[in-house]
């Protein structure tokens, strides 16, 4: 567990008492029982359990948020649960596995990088704002990566469609579906924070969470656009595959058109009639081969 004094430029302190000073407390899941006197048993239990649904609950003097941090590992999307308790004088973040986003935020705050709001207000709700803002940016970057991968596959499909392209496309669509399931609930978290039923955010800071809500809407719009683009890529694959099949059928049609008359002639000459042209001619075979070859050449030129 790490306790930061927000007012003293995030100085690490050993102890903290409620309302003593604004604090940011980072905890691992096995330490969350230390806060059982401050928060409800249900919330504490959800911090320990895995695979809980994303949610937000407003209590008398704090708000509990369960949200997923999305990451890409070898192109596969995984989620890491982050539990947040927000009060007027504290913010507690509980994580089950290391989340680099939090520590990157701490470093940026100490270096006064991309965190200028702290010059105006060093409150826990501003920390929550920056956490959510970075989650949204992180999610948008993942969507952008999937879009780039989809565009790359589309270009390869237009050059030469292969079955591997379909497998890659299906993988991206599966990851996009997983991403949609993880991102959609964030919209309801944003709406609840804007309402601020228990007033832990404060009227002055609501404007920042309205901005978060706007970013969430844009994020979901980007996600919808990604789904549409992947559908277009799938259509492009099917179209190119159909064109390739049509070209192949065209070749078979030409072959059939060329050899069908030849087969008819050879079938006639294979009949057991005594009186048959070229049958008694010494050069009949060669003449017939020449005629058949000439016909094949003429028919090929006509169809090509």
Feature locations, PLM:
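Hydrophobic alpha-helical transmembrane segments
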Residues: 120-121, 193-209, 227-242
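Peripheral, non-transmembrane regulatory/ligand-interaction domains of membrane transport proteins
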Residues: 1-195, 202, 211, 215-218
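Flexible domain-boundary/linker segments
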Residues: 52, 163, 186, 193, ...
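Hydrophobic alpha-helical transmembrane segments and their immediately adjacent juxtamembrane loops
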Residues: 217-304
